[in-house]
């Protein structure tokens, strides 16, 4: 459920996951430390990184004060080595199914490079499009905050060999299928970058 302040009375679960250092409200921390209950396992999920500090910090305890005594928060760092928290991958992540061309009513032309674009709204779209236009390219622009500025950057620009298509909102499954169908994927955000890596065509 979505939380709002003041926080309603909520009993902590056996495991509490705090994402990216966003501390739970003090009243919830106190509930976690109540003497009448066993303290939950408190995990601080950190950002994905390939930096050396990930292995140094993964699994470290961090004592936290509360009205009823100290709790322990444990750092969890996703990463790319055995000394990190690793990455999640479901059994069929490397083979999510057939390309979603039929659902999108779209088909790449023979010899056309397929490129997906999921970016921030202030990305340098114009420069990218100029580079992509040097050879036959089907550019698939995902729905979201970047779609409108990306389409605007195409206006009045010689598109040469670039064919752009604005995509509707996709399910995670269909987005995975799209990533696997493309030759190059521009992705933003940890989860999407990892999904592009599983597809074998990240950027």
Show where each model-derived region lies.
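Hydrophobic/aromatic beta-strand patches that form the interior of the parallel beta-sheet core
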Residues: 17, 41-43, 75-78, 140, ...
């Amino acid at each position: 459920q979505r939380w709002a302040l003041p926080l309603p009375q909520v009993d902590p679960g056996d495991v509490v996951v705090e994402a990216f250092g966003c501390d739970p409200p003090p009243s919830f921390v106190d509930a976690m430390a109540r003497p009448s209950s066993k303290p939950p396992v408190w995990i601080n999920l950190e950002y994905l990184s390939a930096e050396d500090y990930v292995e140094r910090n993964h699994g470290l305890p961090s004592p936290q004060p509360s009205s009823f005594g100290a709790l322990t928060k444990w750092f969890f760092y996703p990463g790319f080595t055995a000394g990190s928290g690793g990455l999640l991958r479901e059994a069929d992540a490397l083979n999510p199914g057939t390309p979603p061309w039929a659902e999108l009513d779209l088909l790449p032309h023979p010899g056309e490079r397929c490129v997906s674009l999921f970016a921030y709204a202030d990305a340098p779209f114009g420069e990218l499009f100029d580079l992509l236009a040097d050879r036959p390219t089907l550019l698939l622009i995902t729905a979201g905050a970047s779609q409108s500025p990306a389409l605007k950057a195409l206006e009045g620009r010689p598109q040469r060999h670039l064919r752009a298509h604005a995509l509707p909102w996709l399910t995670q499954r269909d987005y995975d299928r799209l990533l696997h169908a493309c030759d190059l994927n521009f992705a933003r955000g940890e989860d999407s970058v990892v999904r592009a890596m599983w597809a074998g065509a990240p950027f």
